């Protein structure tokens, strides 16, 4: 036996994680050394070893024709390195739904690099720049958060074989092929439109497709257009043109869209036949009237305020409006803000319900003035000059579940019991987006139930994953059934697979799952002791979720906060632009 010394592998922490025989007879070894990856290329004929250290953790990695192809973990990029000197030859931005949390299934076959992830099956010709999306798995089995992709193989007949493990730990294998003779589904096509991808939507597509094999389900994402340079207004305007031309989708995820306008114009089908038992009735019926239920939220974010001290409890419990909170908000030891965007994001949802009434198109000028005046007073009192809190960025953090899914979740930046031990704040306001995260952040610093947990004045919540079915569709019944399936997907099993951008409307599901993890044995209160379900029952009013209106208000509010324009100019600009926006909706 002959040994080939490799200096990089002599380190104590070096861990070999991959070994392949390349087509040219060379041996390609991948090793993890600390937080980086080392690639070693060995020529058996000369016993020479070439070591390449890219400076990041790359996996999986492949060698072909003098180049190393490596996926950068924690990012959405693929790097091509010169195998002789490690120089970057090419870098690709991958069409991934989320950064690679673990090695995806990948292989080099037939002069192509192919890989499979939760977005689909993709390939790049070696030495080329053209990326091909061979299967959009946002509508297929690989989209399921419970399926862990492990390997992919392309056979000589053009079949892509993908293996992995499901939620039950059972091995599964799928074959993907393009069949020119395949019959079109007899039940037609059900088209679902959403601004953004989501775990709940993916789970529903897979569940519905398995229950209705006679029908094809297609999901269209507005985010794809945003990635191609369109603005939010452009995306919504294009969708509206399609809807009113009778060429729109069948099912809508209404988040960010003018849902109130759609209801007033009578273009949404009645969802009253969907069984909403065991749900928060105050949430699921927020868009219902005596004639029917026109939109159905499947998640929601409560607008909450909470505090540690008994002193602030008394003051907060008596607050009837935003003005009543102003003195408390202005004191940094009560509510800590370092970015005016974060302040706006925490208070706007509750205020929007008063500024833009659900019942009609128009602006409540008094409510608008109150919101702008109070938030401007906080900006001045706390001397906030930056747009974003340096600790929390734009107010969104990334939570990852055991399934590797990464989803944006809003974390109240004023709650600094956990984030700022050196400069704590007694109170917090915000729109917590996950039952688990709400519990963790409420008890993490003190290990006790807060002195007060209540809705912000107005008892407002933000509807999320609000579903609607267009009554102009020829698939109305199928669309209603799809929404019903979506509600049925809110189970403890799904709740345990990742974080969500809101609370389930199915009451008690997330509480039961979180309670299994935090049962009081660690000395902290149990989730049920927070009594959040009782707080949720107090919520009565949906916030205005129209993304165009929110951006319109924020753009002008930012000018006020930075001193570029005064209050009167800000109010006048918002009123003028809102009138134009509403006129366009007619």
At which residue positions do the language-model features occur?
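Hinge/lid segment of periplasmic solute-binding proteins
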Residues: 254-304, 314, 450-454
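Helix-loop-helix "hinge/cap" segment bordering the ligand-binding cleft or interdomain interface
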Residues: 3, 43, 288-395, 471, ...
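Extracytoplasmic/periplasmic substrate-binding proteins
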Residues: 378-475
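Conserved N-terminal structural module of periplasmic/extracytoplasmic solute-binding proteins
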Residues: 19, 59-66, 70-76, 83-85, ...
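Conserved C-terminal helix/tail region of periplasmic/extracytoplasmic solute-binding proteins
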Residues: 165, 169, 513-586
């Amino acid at each position: 036996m002959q040994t080939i010394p490799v200096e990089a592998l002599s380190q104590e922490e070096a861990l070999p994680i991959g070994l392949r025989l390349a087509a040219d007879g060379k041996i390609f070894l991948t090793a993890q050394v600390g937080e980086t990856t080392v690639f070693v290329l060995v020529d058996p004929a000369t016993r020479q070893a070439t070591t390449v250290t890219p400076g990041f953790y790359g996996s999986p990695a492949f060698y072909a024709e003098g180049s190393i192809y490596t996926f950068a973990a924690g990012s959405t990029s693929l790097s091509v390195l010169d195998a002789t000197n490690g120089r970057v030859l090419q870098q690709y931005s991958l069409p991934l739904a989320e950064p690679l949390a673990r090695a995806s299934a990948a292989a080099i076959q037939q002069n192509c690099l192919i890989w499979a992830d939760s977005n689909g099956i993709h390939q790049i010709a070696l030495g080329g720049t053209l990326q091909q999306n061979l299967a959009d798995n946002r509508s297929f089995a690989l989209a399921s958060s419970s399926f862990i992709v492990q390997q992919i193989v392309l056979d000589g007949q053009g079949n892509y074989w993908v293996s992995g493990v499901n939620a039950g730990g059972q091995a599964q294998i799928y074959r993907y092929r393009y069949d020119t003779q395949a019959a079109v589904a007899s039940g037609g096509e059900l088209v679902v439109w959403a601004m953004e991808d989501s775990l709940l939507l993916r789970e529903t597509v897979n569940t519905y497709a398995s229950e209705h094999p006679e029908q094809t389900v297609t999901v269209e994402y507005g985010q794809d257009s945003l990635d191609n340079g369109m603005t939010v207004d452009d995306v919504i305007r294009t969708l509206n043109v399609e809807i009113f031309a009778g060429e729109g989708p069948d099912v809508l995820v209404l988040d960010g869209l003018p849902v109130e306008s759609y209801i007033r114009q009578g273009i949404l089908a009645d969802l009253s036949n969907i069984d909403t038992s065991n749900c928060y009735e105050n949430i699921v019926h927020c868009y219902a009237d005596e004639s029917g239920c026109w939109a159905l939220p499947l998640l929601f974010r409560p607008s909450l305020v909470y505090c540690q001290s008994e002193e602030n409890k008394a003051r907060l419990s008596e607050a009837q409006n935003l003005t009543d909170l102003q003195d408390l908000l202005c004191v940094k030891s009560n509510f800590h803000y370092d970015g005016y965007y974060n302040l706006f994001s925490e208070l706007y949802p509750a205020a929007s319900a008063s500024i833009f009434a659900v019942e009609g198109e128009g602006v409540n000028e008094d409510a608008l003035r109150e919101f702008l005046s109070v938030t401007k007073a906080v900006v001045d009192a706390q001397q906030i000059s930056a747009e974003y809190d340096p600790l929390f960025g734009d107010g969104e953090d990334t939570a990852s579940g055991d399934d590797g899914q990464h989803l944006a979740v809003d974390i109240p930046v004023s709650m600094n019991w956990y984030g700022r031990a050196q400069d704590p704040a007694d109170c917090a306001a915000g729109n917590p987006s996950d039952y688990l995260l709400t519990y963790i952040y409420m008890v993490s610093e003190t290990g006790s139930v807060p002195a007060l947990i209540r809705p912000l004045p107005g008892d407002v919540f933000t509807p999320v994953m609000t579903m609607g079915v267009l009554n102009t569709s020829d698939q109305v019944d199928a669309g209603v059934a799809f929404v019903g399936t979506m509600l049925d997907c809110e189970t403890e099993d799904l709740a345990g697979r990742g974080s969500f951008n809101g609370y389930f409307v199915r009451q008690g599901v997330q509480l039961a799952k979180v309670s299994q993890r935090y049962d009081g044995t660690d000395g902290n209160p149990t989730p049920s002791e927070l009594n959040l379900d009782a707080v949720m029952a107090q919520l009565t009013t949906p916030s205005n979720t129209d993304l165009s209106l929110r951006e319109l208000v924020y753009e002008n509010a930012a000018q006020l906060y930075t001193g570029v324009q005064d209050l009167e100019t800000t109010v006048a600009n918002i009123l003028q632009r809102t009138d134009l926006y509403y006129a366009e909706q007619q």
